[in-house]
Every structure is written in structure tokens, then in C-alpha cells.
Amino acid sequence: MAGHSKWANTKHRKAAQDAKRGKIFTKIIRELVTAARLGGGDVGSNPRLRAAVDKALANNMTRDTLNRAIARGVGGGDDAQMETIIYEGYGPGGTAVMVECLSDNRNRTVSEVRHAFTKTGGNLGTDGSVSYLFTKRGVISFAPGLSEDTIMDAALEAGADDVITYDDGAIDVYTTPEAFGEVKDALEAAGLTPEASEVALVPSTRTDLDAETAPKLLRLIDMLEDSDDVQEVYHNGEISDEVAATL
């Protein structure tokens, strides 16, 4: 959608769909448990856990619930067998797609992911087939109406990598994964509340989708997100305002 932050729009759509399915808490709890198990329970020294906590709070999870999930991760238990698996492939229109999963059964997960790609005209790729098009970055998105100079000054002083302003006034701040929490804290301390924020795989290039291929990509995303094992779906598909109006 030209002229404004594609990142926030894509993530908001996903959040709304996940919430509608009642899956988002299950997925966030899995991520909290795994992040705490792998990196410890201190959000100050565990960027992955910090990102998961931010996502939990943004989706109105109670502190009690998220603290219990962190405690489960630190203490081990049944969740200790969960592993992070990343699949990559080509979606409709040649779009590059990355699928982040948390699973205790690789065979089940890859079967579900492959089925989604096949049903929508894409194909599951090999390791490295599209991952070179993505970089893990912190993304902090602001809605139109805030001062570009204020956000830029606060973000760059706190260690952000880049600040992008869109035609409609929306602003995205990009950071390294390690600096994500510090930059977000600095922005919030300056009275700047983000519309969305997370550590994510950000594409370096975009693939334009027409009115025929765009619905197929959206169907692929829906099918992937229907899997309890799938945590995040990232892609480089570009849907123009004109095409979006036909969907």
C-alpha cells in the first residue's frame, strides 16, 4: 500500500486475524517460554524475551500470565522440547516467504507448512533459498501525526539504525535486535508511544502483486497462521492501493 508504512499495516492485519482465531495467546506464551528457556528470564539482557513481553502486553495479556510463562521457561518442564524452526519458500507471484515456527514435532510442522505452500501455488524452498532477502531488525512504528524531527532525534540518539517517514506521515524506526529494547524505552520516555513494535525479518526488496496473485498470497498467509506451530509469517509481497481496493 504505497505511501505509508506497509510494516504496521501487515502486522495489524495479522494481529487482528490471530485474535479472531483465539490463537494469539497460545503463540505468545510459547514464545515467552522458549525465549526465557534459551536466554534467561531477564528482559534487560534477553532481547528476544523483551520483544515477546512487548507483544504480550500489546495484546492485553496480564502480567500474571506472562510472568508464569517466563517462569515455566526458566524452570524447564514440558515446554523445554519446543524448538525454533524457520522455513522459507516462494509464494504466489514469486514472493519470498519466511515462516518462523515453534514446534515439538518437526514432521507435523513441515507437513502443514508444505501443504499451505502447495495449495496456494507456491513451493517450500531449501535453506538459503530466500533468507538472503531478509534481515532481522527491530521495527518501531508510529502513526501519522507525530513530529518527525522529535522521533528522529530521540531514535538516533538512542542508537537506532534508520528512520523512515512515509507520505501519509507514518514513521518506522529500525534498530538492531540488540538495541530494540533500549531504543523503544528511550522513545517512550520522550513521550512517543509506538503504534506497533517488534523484532522481525524485514525484506530488502519487494515483489509487486497484481489482482490475481495478491489474494493467493493472503490465502497462503491465512493457511500458515492457522497452524498452532507457526509464530510469524514474513514476506516481500507488495500490494498497491489499487489492487487492495479490489480485494
From Swiss-Prot:
Which Pfam families would you find in this protein's record? TACO1_YebC_N (PF20772), Transcrip_reg (PF01709)
Species of origin reads Sodalis glossinidius (strain morsitans)
Look up the domain of life of the source.
Bacteria
| A GO MF label | DNA binding
**GO CC annotation: what is one?**
cytosol
Where is this protein primarily located? cytoplasm
Q: Which keywords accompany this UniProt record?
A: Cytoplasm, DNA-binding, Transcription, Transcription regulation
Q: Listed disulfide bonds for this chain?
A: none
Keyword Cytoplasm appears in the UniProt entry: yes
The name under which this protein is listed is: Probable transcriptional regulatory protein SG1259
| Keyword set includes Transferase | no
Localization: Cytoplasm
GO annotation, biological process: regulation of DNA-templated transcription
Question: Which family is this protein grouped under?
Answer: Belongs to the TACO1 family.
